Amino acid sequence: MPLRLPDKLPAIELLKHENIFVMDESRAHSQEIRPLRIVVLNLMPLKITTETDLVRLLSHTPLQIEVYFMKLKSHTPKNTPIEHMMMFYKDFAELSKQKFDGMIVTGAPIETMQYEDVEYWPEIQQIFDWARTHVTSTLYICWGAQAGLYHFYGVPKHPLSKKMFGIFRQKSLDPSLPIFRGFDDWFAMPQSRHTEVRREDIEKVPGLDIIAESPESGVSIVMARGGREFFVTGHLEYAPDTLDKEYRRDLGKRDDVDLPKNYYYHDDPTEEPLVTWRAHANLFYSNWINYYVYQETPYNIDDIK
């Protein structure tokens, strides 16, 4: 089954060019199926890009999925047209009385700030607490993962001496978990961050399980509450050219910008990036949807608790 997306969402036309089948709301209403309801709290500056990246991954499942986009009342985006936000996004207050089968919390370019100094931190905390009783399984990404680990479990973040930037090999530590079904022994994950969470801090917290990590980039996936929460420190959702755009953007601002590791062919930025993470990204999201959302959520969505 395809994704059900709001009519006129830009991602629809972009993904049709990639031969991904999506369905707008008007057509989806003709199918008498209870779709899975996934809400995305999109904190990234380039919201349309992030929408497309996530919708692309959510499309690789036979299940019908209805996607909602949540915005913060305490923050006004500067890089996305207000008309787009008004048409496709709803405030937390509008969505808080509803329940969802799954939720995705994206990263945000604020990782060097203390959490309490972030203008929308109180609203984020409220949303995180709400998700525990209104969502079957929540996927926290990059800064979202760090923020979730800090809010729920007190896990601190630590500054890195150098930006973690590139594609890094990850090892699944418990291949028997459904989230890793079909995975190879190693898988690649894009990373782009200035801070980290550390194994020694996570190991102090009962109920947190490190399920994937890298000898070079550290902890990559943490699971909690039997899969009702996943914290992913990298960006499996990134498009092939995302790190290239970040590299060239930063190069235009200063001269001491390192190449993203393990990304360009022969480490030559004039060459095309090597896409080594796409298959596992699709598998990760499909496994999350199938084993931790679809198979765990009640048929009557109001029974989620």
Where are these regions (language model features)?
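Short, glycine/charged-enriched secondary-structure capping and boundary segments
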Residues: D53-V55, H84, D117-Y120, Y153-P156, ...
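Cysteine-nucleophile active-site neighborhood
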Residues: V105-D174
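Short, Asp-centered acidic motifs that coordinate Mg2+ and/or phosphate
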Residues: G102
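N-terminal beta-loop-helix "entrance" segment that forms/cooperates
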Residues: K73-M86
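Amide-donor transfer/coupling interface in amidating biosynthetic enzymes
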Residues: M1-S74, Y89, A93-L95, K99, ...
